[in-house]
A protein has these predicted regions:
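Short acidic/histidine-rich active-site segments
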Residues: 62, 89-112
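Alpha-helix N-cap and loop-to-helix initiation/capping positions
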Residues: 39-43, 73-77, 109-116
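A conserved active-site cap/scaffold subdomain adjacent to cofactor or substrate pockets
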Residues: 52-67
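Acidic, His- and aromatic-enriched active-site or binding-groove loops in soluble protein domains
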Residues: 26-34
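Active-site environment of divalent metal-dependent phosphoester hydrolases
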Residues: 10-16, 33-36, 65-67, 102-104
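Conserved, mostly hydrophobic/aromatic
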Residues: 5, 30, 58, 99, ...
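Mid-to-C-terminal alpha-helical segments outside catalytic/metal-binding sites
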Residues: 113-150
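Histidine/acidic residue-rich metal-binding segments in metalloenzymes
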Residues: 1-27, 40-55, 76-92
Length: 150
């Protein structure tokens, strides 16, 4: 059977050790882009490329600390991370990893605080030029592709 390896809570060294010593699909269930917000939990561009090379997913985490260095993040910050990954490796490697159950109230976004607010993200993706099939991939189809292989 195939396995999926989640590297979200791994150090960068552990990430690269995992790449070197395994062949399974890599996912970051709830991580963002280090080049936009240099939090140690976020992924470098090289890590994002390695995940894509293994046909994995980066699940965008909706925690202000991982989206924006200072202040409270909002949907615009999510879009910045999605655009960065899209430009770097393509739309097929982006999903959501909201971590709504793990984010303290003080680190929640100003406009998306729970699942009921997801239409805000969908509308912002449309305004940002994403097509419906691309939005569907981000909102769940990419995860279904990865999960169907185990």
């Amino acid at each position: 059977k195939n396995i999926i390896i989640d590297i979200s809570h791994s150090s960068e060294q552990t990430f690269w050790d995992t790449v070197k010593n395994t062949t399974g699909t890599l996912v970051a269930t709830h991580s963002n882009c280090y080049s936009i917000c240099n939090h140690p939990r976020n992924l470098t561009d090289e890590q994002i490329k390695a995940i894509a090379k293994r046909n994995g997913i980066i699940g965008i985490c909706l925690c202000s600390l991982f989206l924006k260095k200072e202040g409270t993040a909002n949907v615009t910050d999510i879009i910045r991370h999605i655009k960065h990954i899209t430009n770097l490796v393509g739309i097929d490697y982006i999903g959501l990893g909201t971590d709504f159950d793990g984010v303290d109230e003080e680190h929640r976004l100003s406009d998306i605080k729970g699942i009921k607010d997801m239409p805000i993200l969908i509308n912002e993706l449309r305004k940002s030029g994403y097509l419906e099939d691309q939005i569907d991939k981000i909102m769940g189809e990419n995860w279904m592709r990865v999960l169907s292989k185990i």
